[in-house]
Amino acid sequence: MKIYKCAFCGADILPGYGIMYVKTDGTTLRFCSRKCFVSAVKFKRDPRRLAWVRKRQK
């Protein structure tokens, strides 16, 4: 069993959870929640600027 990291916030994703998004060029992005998915794909937000993201630069 492999534990993946969220492409947006860096949280651990357990097997059977999360969203896998495949781009048209074949790369896969894994997200822990819909909140991360929408922030990254739809709104194209920078995770370093959001307070709730673990990847945030301090």
UniProtKB/Swiss-Prot annotation:
It comes from the Archaea. Keywords: Metal-binding, Ribonucleoprotein, Ribosomal protein, RNA-binding, rRNA-binding, Zinc, Zinc-finger. Pfam families: Ribosomal_L24e. GO terms for molecular function: rRNA binding; structural constituent of ribosome; zinc ion binding. Binds to the 23S rRNA. Zn(2+) binds at C6, C9, C32, C36. A zinc finger (C4-type) spans 6-36. The gene is rpl24e. Binds 1 zinc ion per subunit. Disulfide bonds: none annotated. Part of the 50S ribosomal subunit. Forms a cluster with proteins L3 and L14. This is Large ribosomal subunit protein eL24. NCBIfam families: PRK14891.1-1 (NF034186). GO terms for biological process: translation. Belongs to the eukaryotic ribosomal protein eL24 family. InterPro entries: L24e/L24_sf (IPR038630), Ribosomal_eL24-rel_arc (IPR055345), Ribosomal_eL24-rel_N (IPR000988), Ribosomal_eL24_CS (IPR023442), TRASH_dom (IPR011017). Its cofactor is Zn(2+).
